[in-house]
UniProtKB/Swiss-Prot annotation:
One of its GO terms (cellular component) is cytosol. SMART domains: YqgFc. PANTHER family: POLYNUCLEOTIDYL TRANSFERASE, RIBONUCLEASE H-LIKE SUPERFAMILY PROTEIN (PTHR33317:SF4). This is Putative pre-16S rRNA nuclease. Pfam families: RuvX. Could be a nuclease involved in processing of the 5'-end of pre-16S rRNA. Its EC number is 3.1.-.-. Belongs to the YqgF nuclease family. It is found in: Cytoplasm. Keywords: Cytoplasm, Hydrolase, Nuclease, Ribosome biogenesis. One of its GO terms (biological process) is rRNA 5'-end processing.
Length: 140
């Protein structure tokens, strides 16, 4: 039986979101959540979780290219812990190195510079995080 999984691309101003199914291993972007200094509208996130009822939530873990942590890594972990604490959902972390760069390249390839709006980039980043998580699950 397949799982429904939500993914979040944590940021201090915007949090990208995507939903996917483990059967297909693919994801689709959902509208990004605005955040103020990394604090989201928890009610809006709660509504999203209630609507999709995911079996698992994946949060992108922003690491430096050499695998070391940065300030945003700590904040993304805190966001993941709060998701679990507030909503009781199973949360996993996924290395997200290069997802924003890949997302920008994908969007630019489709529509040029004008297509590069922040919420699209965040949504596609969340898709890439989720799809790479699905790939890692098949390896295990």
């Amino acid at each position: 039986m397949g799982m429904t999984v939500l993914a979040f691309d944590f940021g201090t101003k915007s949090i990208g979101c995507a939903v996917g199914q483990s059967i297909t291993g693919t994801a689709q972007a959902l509208p990004a959540f605005k955040a103020q200094d990394g604090i989201p509208n928890w009610d809006a996130i709660g509504k999203c979780l209630a609507e999709w009822q995911p079996d698992r939530v994946v949060v992108g873990l922003p690491l430096n290219m050499d695998g070391t942590e940065q300030d945003l890594t700590v904040r993304a972990r805190k966001f993941a812990h709060r998701l679990h604490g507030r909503f009781g959902v199973a949360v996993e972390l996924q290395d997200e190195r290069l997802t924003t760069t890949e997302a920008r390249a994908e969007i630019f390839g489709r529509g040029g510079y004008k297509a590069l709006n922040k919420s699209k980039v965040d949504g596609i980043s969340a898709c890439l995080i989720l799809e790479s998580w699905f790939e890692n699950q098949q390896v295990k």
